[in-house]
């Protein structure tokens, strides 16, 4: 792996859990997990290790290089109206197949999408390396960062714009 990233997650559901665990296994540091349900954040943080902070408000997340917004599509608009990352140069990434990249551009100068093409279940083990992942970045540097991040957990990673991703998601 070329670079190890410091990452914080907003969301603790099935996708967040699988992605966070696999990113950590790949050598990245998961600094914090935020969830509306504190017990879910604590459960995931415990699985990720002693240094992972669990909070119930994303405003309490520690400063990170990358913030992954792994929450329900319908919860995203409320989040981007009420939250900004503590690190203004942070890369803010959502994981939705149906939400455009433009929708989060007010959160940071550096935004992107990391979309794993998979339905995630809590108790079903997955080989994340076999899951196709699609990325889109606000600029070429962000796209390259997301390609590197996604390739650390998946063997099948490709760039894909919002319109084609939405079609694929449906």
Regions found by a protein language model. Give the residues of each.
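Hydrophobic Val/Ile/Leu positions in short beta-strands of Rossmann-like dinucleotide-binding domains
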Residues: 8-9, 69, 135
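Internal alpha-helical scaffold of NAD(P)-dependent oxidoreductase catalytic cores
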Residues: 40-47, 125-169
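Alpha-helical elements of the RecA-like P-loop NTPase motor core of helicases
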Residues: 17, 42, 77-78, 102, ...
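Rossmann-like NAD(P)(H) cofactor-binding subdomain of soluble oxidoreductases
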Residues: 38, 48, 52-125
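Phosphate-coordination loops involved in phosphoryl transfer and adenosine-cofactor binding
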Residues: 3-6, 89, 130
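Short phosphate-binding/catalytic loops that engage adenosine nucleotides
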Residues: 28-29, 109, 155
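NAD(P)+-binding Rossmann beta1-loop-alpha1 motif at the extreme N-terminus of oxidoreductases
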Residues: 1-56
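Short alpha-helical
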Residues: 14, 39-40, 74-75, 99, ...
